[in-house]
Structure formats: C-alpha cells, structure tokens
C-alpha cells in the first residue's frame, strides 16, 4: 500500500500538467498503471481472475 501522504499529494491539483501522474485507485501504486482501468498490473490481474472486470478474459491462442 502507498503512503497516505503520497496519495494525498498526488490528488492535489498540480501547478503544471506535466507533473500529474497516474496512481492505482485500489492500492495507490504509482507504477505500471493501466489508464483505461485506473488499476496497477497487480490489482488488474487479481480482479480479472475473479471475473470482476467486465469484458476481460484470459487470452489463449
């Protein structure tokens, strides 16, 4: 889990748009966040395996 202070800092409106960054809405992780789902890869994988993300299924080819 991310520090509460860092999550609060990220949620503030930044003075410059280039300073804004994505964070996982579930756990607060700042790296490897899928913008479309607003989830990090770890949370995305957990929820996808449980079937809680509509339209997502395991690929097989």
UniProtKB/Swiss-Prot annotation:
One of its GO terms (molecular function) is rRNA binding. Its cofactor is Zn(2+). Keywords: Metal-binding, Ribonucleoprotein, Ribosomal protein, RNA-binding, rRNA-binding, Zinc. Binds 1 zinc ion per subunit. It comes from the Bacteria. InterPro entries: Ribosomal_uS14, Ribosomal_uS14_bact, Ribosomal_uS14_CS, Ribosomal_uS14_sf. Zn(2+) binds at residues 24, 27, 40, 43. The keyword Endoplasmic reticulum does not apply. Pfam families: Ribosomal_S14. Binds 16S rRNA, required for the assembly of 30S particles and may also be responsible for determining the conformation of the 16S rRNA at the A site. NCBIfam families: PRK08061.1. Part of the 30S ribosomal subunit. Contacts proteins S3 and S10. Belongs to the universal ribosomal protein uS14 family. Zinc-binding uS14 subfamily. This is Small ribosomal subunit protein uS14B. It comes from Staphylococcus aureus (strain NCTC 8325 / PS 47).
């Amino acid at each position: 889990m991310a520090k509460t202070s860092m999550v609060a800092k990220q949620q503030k409106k930044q003075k410059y748009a280039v300073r804004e960054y994505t964070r996982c809405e579930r756990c607060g992780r700042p790296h490897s966040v899928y913008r479309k789902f607003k989830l990090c890869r770890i949370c995305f994988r957990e929820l996808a395996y449980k079937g809680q993300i509509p339209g997502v299924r395991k690929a097989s080819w």
